[in-house]
Amino acid sequence: MFNFLKRDNGKVISINGIDSLLGKINLIDVREIYEYRNGSLKTARNIPMGNLLNNPDRYLKEEDEYYLMCQTGSRSSLACRRLTKEGFNVINVRGGIGAYKGAKRK
């Protein structure tokens, strides 16, 4: 149903699978505030990666599921690996906002 891929570094969703989920998921943009202000997905909450990793319990609940994105998917992938090790249910949005802006939207 959803375009998930399982990798050694955790769960990943293709940018093509995100449109139908917007508004139904906990989407976190881990870019810095200045990057986020230059454009993000309208339902994304901005929590810079450093803040999120330094204090995940402040922002996340272990029983909930979160989708993490950044500009290219690299930072969010790193964050997902660490948060998964800490017991959080996170999914990396592969390609990030850069791929989203570059992809044809339906």
Predicted segment positions?
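Rhodanese-like catalytic fold shared by cysteine-dependent sulfurtransferases
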Residues: M1-N16, L21-I25, I33-E65, S74-K106
